[in-house]
A protein has these predicted regions:
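Intrinsic low-complexity, repeat-rich intrinsically disordered segments enriched
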Residues: 1-49, 59-60
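A short, sequence-level motif marking secondary-structure junctions
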Residues: 4-11, 83-89, 143-145
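Broad, structure-driven detector of short, well-ordered beta-strand segments within folded domains
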Residues: 5, 78-86, 108-117
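Beta-rich globular "head" domains
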Residues: 51-87
Length: 147
């Protein structure tokens, strides 16, 4: 094995020296699954509302978002924190933190979108940008299990 990664079967503990890199990470497994952290991205070039992130509705009871929006041509960056609670088709959310360098780049909304022939029902994060400049979004999504 690798000396930087050690698994102790007796204590059921894995120890790692160094950096762990992952795009998805789940806390808990099986019946104990609780939270999955995912990294997602989006881009807008319009002032209309755009879906920048979606999560299958049947799998979550809550979703938290950390959004970093960047408009290089406007030399602006906005960071936003949103938390949401989901039950069946009802979604309540609050944007509880926003800070920016330069201009505010977008408003955000979290909505339940019913399923159709192409995809199951989704919890969707929409961005409504302030300009038509290209705005890039990096999103850390924390999905809390519905089971």
């Amino acid at each position: 094995g690798d000396a930087n990664v050690v698994y102790n079967k007796a204590t059921n503990v894995m120890t790692m020296a160094g950096t762990l890199v992952a795009n998805n990470m789940t806390t808990g497994s099986g019946a104990y699954a609780f939270r999955t952290a995912k990294v997602k991205t989006g881009v807008t070039t319009t002032t209309s509302a755009v879906e920048i992130c979606a999560t299958e509705a049947s799998t979550v009871s809550a979703v938290d978002y950390t959004i970093v929006a960047t408009d290089v041509s406007n030399q602006s960056r906005q960071t936003v924190k949103i938390t949401s609670a989901i039950f069946a088709t009802t979604v309540n959310y609050t944007e509880y933190a926003t800070i920016s360098v330069g201009s505010l780049l977008a408003d955000f909304a979290v909505t339940y979108v019913p399923g159709d022939a192409f995809r199951n029902a989704q919890i969707v994060l929409y961005a409504t940008p302030a300009t038509t400049n290209t705005t890039n979004y990096k999103i850390l999504v924390d999905e809390y299990s519905s089971s």
